[in-house]
Structures are given as structure tokens and as C-alpha cells.
């Protein structure tokens, strides 16, 4: 949860039951900033939304009280974290981890937002960027490639929090 270590590398070796999601865009992608977004059920009755808006961490994380604006104590006990955020241009990598004991009943949704082209709803720059998402879970690695469609928001997959079944969405839209 330390914001000063956002540029460090994250290992793909993780504990059983833990899921790591890694977003990557390359040097020649034409993109400067792509943001990871994960929503899911929190410890309370609502949903969390993990992402990094304008340099301020916005998520429910138990050890980051000072930057979790409006979070209740029970929401802060959700240990899902944005481990690495990259906002300094290409190439870039962002990492989200869901520890084994943090899974809640309900649907999780992972998306990537082309922040570079956020003002263009009909852009195809994201679709030709070569951006990938890799998911590591229980000794398996799954790779998702950005679809060839216009838009600046890529909804990659959903996860059932009870069964941990990942369902591919792979859809583009605009925000």
C-alpha cells in the first residue's frame, strides 16, 4: 500500500488462491497512460473500485487509511490492492492483486482505460496498441489481447468471487 513504491517490479510467483492481474502496454503502443480498474464486492454491502485517479490512490485497503477517502473500517479490511501504477509513459505496467483470503461472494470486473485517448470516444488507437493483460492464478497464466474495436475502455473479464471462474468479456466501449 505504499505509494512511493509504485514503479517497482512485481513477481508473478504468488500464493495459492491469490490472483495477480498485470496490464502492459509497449514502447511503440502509441499510448502514454493506460489505467487498470477493478470493481468488486466489498466487506460491507457495496462495491469497491480500485484505480489511480490523478495521482491519488482510490481503493479500500486496510493499511492505507490516510488515502482511502470515505472508507469505513470494514471496507478498509478488504486487502485487494493496486500494487503498481504506471503513469510516466510507455512502456507501462500496472498490477492488481487479490489475495486468497480476500475473495467475496459476487462479481468482480476488470477493465483497462486508455487514459491517453480519454477524450476520443471513437478512437481505434487502443485497439492497435498491442496492449495485453495477463492473469496469474493457481499456477496458470492466461493472456488477453486488446480487441480490434473502437473505444477507450476495454472490459477484459469478470470473476465469480465464490467459484473464482473467470469469464472473458473482451469488449470495447467509450467513456
Task: Describe the role of every protein-language-model region.
Residues 1-17:
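Elongated, non-catalytic scaffold/linker segments and compositionally distinctive motifs
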Residues 14-175:
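Intrinsic-disorder/low-complexity signal
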Amino acid at each position: 500500500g505504499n505509494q512511493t513504491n509504485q514503479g517497482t517490479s512485481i513477481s508473478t510467483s504468488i500464493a495459492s488462491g491469490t490472483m495477480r492481474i498485470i496490464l502492459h502496454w509497449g514502447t511503440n503502443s502509441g499510448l502514454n497512460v493506460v489505467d487498470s480498474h477493478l470493481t468488486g464486492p466489498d466487506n460491507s454491502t457495496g462495491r469497491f473500485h480500485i484505480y489511480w485517479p490523478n495521482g491519488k490512490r482510490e481503493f479500500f485497503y486496510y493499511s492505507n487509511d490516510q488515502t482511502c477517502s470515505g472508507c469505513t473500517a470494514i471496507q478498509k479490511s478488504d486487502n485487494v490492492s493496486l500494487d503498481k501504477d504506471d503513469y510516466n509513459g510507455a512502456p507501462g505496467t500496472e498490477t492488481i492483486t487479490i489475495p486468497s483470503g480476500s475473495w467475496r461472494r459476487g462479481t468482480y470486473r476488470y477493465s483497462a482505460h486508455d487514459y491517453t485517448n480519454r477524450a476520443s470516444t471513437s478512437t481505434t488507437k487502443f485497439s492497435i496498441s498491442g496492449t495485453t493483460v495477463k492473469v496469474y492464478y493457481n499456477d496458470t497464466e492466461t493472456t488477453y489481447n486488446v480487441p480490434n474495436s473502437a473505444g477507450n475502455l476495454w472490459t477484459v473479464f469478470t470473476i465469480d468471487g465464490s467459484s473464482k471462474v473467470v469469464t472473458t468479456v473482451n469488449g470495447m466501449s467509450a467513456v
